């Protein structure tokens, strides 16, 4: 089928977005802090963004100085928020804010874990930031991905998938259709992908491959496949012949740049991240602010999000807590290591900096990923998969936690830091100090489990069939992976 068919197919599609009411998450009202950059507060338009969040969640507004984010710690320790949202113009939304925010929010109390679900609201302009704040919940039922194959779109209402390993292939599934159609895209996959974005609204965009703050290569390691770039806040597709096509996809979506270097770094007003927010419809975006080689945060957040258990913001936050758990199992001394926030950091420089402290590739990768992966958007906005995609239903009632397996789920046969993702549970309220997780009927705390004021981690092993139910309680005790 010729690539021109793609244009005719997508031209017939009416714009739509999948919007649904939010399901159970901790209530953000009254436990939300809006942290507004002091310089940004001088703009009336940006002040309106912060005010909208305050009104939405009965939030507390605090101002911070971009030169020292940690300066708001006394206020955070007093308020003990469940959610923290940093509001800033893009000129001050760079890597230093991402790193300092992550490090600051681990210091609200005395355990080594993050103490609030957080995000950064920014954009090419204040209107983009306001769209992050004011929009409806999103129920993710359509997808676009750069990692496609012939079965990628099965189970999705509609979407499209390019293949970063093949210049000539792309798959399209139109709204209302049950069939996936393969499209020939060579020699201009960039134009074909731009046309798909213009014609088919999707809720979820996920990518890998080469990227920087200023471009994304469509076909891995093959410049002839073209790229996406930005110009004056707009996304543009560029072919290898320097032909241009506008990438315009304004419907609200979440973008997870799971395997891309640098595309999550807002290094100024005009960059790839702000272009996705401005003309690409990204009201939430997750991505690396550095080169990525280990991938725990990117692929882990994607996996947790796609489990259906969590919103995108919860997946970002909880995957980071799993990473901190893994660091604690490998080398607790690394919990005190802080990546420099104010200087440009390459992997080589980081390796030299960590000589004598890092012993393994896992320790290096986990420490590198810990504070360098960003979440942009309102952290309390519900962006999640529909109930039918959930693999485990998690219920919390007082000190009791129940896991109901809705599908067959397999975990590694033994606890391993790189492959084990404990089941993460957001708690309704902070449990008493000195408590641990116990399996139903168990007399000893569950090995390697964690309980904090915000969440619990329950490591599981082996296969768990659909229909199985597991029950746990939180009561006095201390596990081998205690928060201390």
What are the language-model segments listed below?
Residues 17-22:
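Boundary at the C-terminal end of the N-terminal hydrophobic targeting segment
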